[in-house]
Amino acid sequence: MNAAQYLLDRMRTCKGLTEIGDKKAPGCFSSVGSATHSFHGDDAVGFGPSYMVVADGVSGTMKASGVLARMLVGETLTSLSKLRKRSREEPPCAEDFGRSMQAATKSARKLAKRKGRLDSTISAVFFDETSRQMFVYTIGDCKCVVFRGGALVFESDSIVYDFNVPAVVSSNQAINYATEVQVQTFEYETGDVCLLFSDGVHDNLFVDDIASCVGSAEISSSARSKSGAAEEMARRTVQRAKDTFTCNTQYIPFAVSAAGFCLEALSELEANKTVDAEEFERFRRKCETIPSLDVKRATFSKEQRVRQLAFYSASNLLAFAHKKQGKRDDISVCAAILA
């Protein structure tokens, strides 16, 4: 079965599972939708009545990892549909959600085992209507965020090894992030806007950029149909990120993050007594004059650095820290307005 056949088969399976017993259940969303832009073709996105998932295949491997990303999304939709059925009898807890996600990632890895090395990040969110709790599971640097009244009130933690080096689900056992994922929880309210997106969004857009997309879509949709408001939010966010590829004159969040890692690298080099003194001094002077360090706009920067892995050289980091043009990448956004 090739990737296209697999995805079609899984979509049919997920539809059947979702329809069983769900016809009278309104779900947690008053509006839900998604939008994408394909550059490498390695992202995948999906959603059901009370859950959303985004996976971002790593394009730096020998093979395109979009296959694994699509498998992860398909298996997650199936697993969370089953969790939703069970939750009608007993409200789920973080551990229940975590086990469902572990089962989904394990199944996807098994399906991808004979396809060579494939890597992907993933983030999924599940909403429980009874407790009003949302559960977030993340491996890598996809993000789950919540806006309330135009303000950012929740941001999930990225799991990373180094600058622009996320932890991944991998078909290669040595690469796969095997540490137990800590599920994050948040109590949501009616009218909250939840967005799930790949790093093609937060590498290029600041918090106020996305807040603007959310706000303008709400105003626009109020004059038309509120049922399409979430999809409009997703579409506007994708377009705003795409616009940075060609018409951006300010430093992007990717540059701001790189500047921060430059300062970390400076501290590490200072502690390393084997570094040439003249080279260190040159790097120190360059770090002191990085203009993106002066950017005050809020970025989506919450992360857990779970391993010290110096992947990029100091010169690479300096180059990234001066980046103004958008970082071209796949862009995937799933948005929901909570009921």
Label each region the model flagged.
Residues 1-339:
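PP2C/PPM-type serine/threonine phosphatase catalytic domain
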